[in-house]
């Protein structure tokens, strides 16, 4: 079974890191309304654009998404 993007993102958490994707993961962990079961780029992207004040740039999401795709293949 393929893991959701959120499940993958949680593997990227590191509270002591300056890596932007890891910071995104750290912040997403505290986002109680994040679409935790989604594997859909558009759904997650739309959610982040509308709700994630903690994400300074969608480029960070794009990088995290690429890591997710690479890990799933």
From Swiss-Prot:
Natural source organism: Limosilactobacillus reuteri (strain DSM 20016) (Lactobacillus reuteri)
Name by which UniProt lists this protein: UPF0346 protein Lreu_0775
Family: Belongs to the UPF0346 family.
Highest taxon, organism lineage: Bacteria
Any matching Pfam family: YozE_SAM_like
């Amino acid at each position: 079974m393929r893991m959701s993007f959120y499940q993958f993102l949680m593997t990227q958490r590191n509270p002591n890191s300056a890596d932007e994707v890891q910071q995104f993961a750290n912040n997403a962990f505290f986002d109680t309304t994040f679409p935790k079961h989604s594997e859909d780029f558009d759904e997650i992207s739309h959610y982040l654009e509308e709700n994630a004040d903690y994400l300074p740039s969608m480029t960070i999401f794009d990088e995290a998404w690429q890591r997710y795709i690479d890990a799933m293949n």
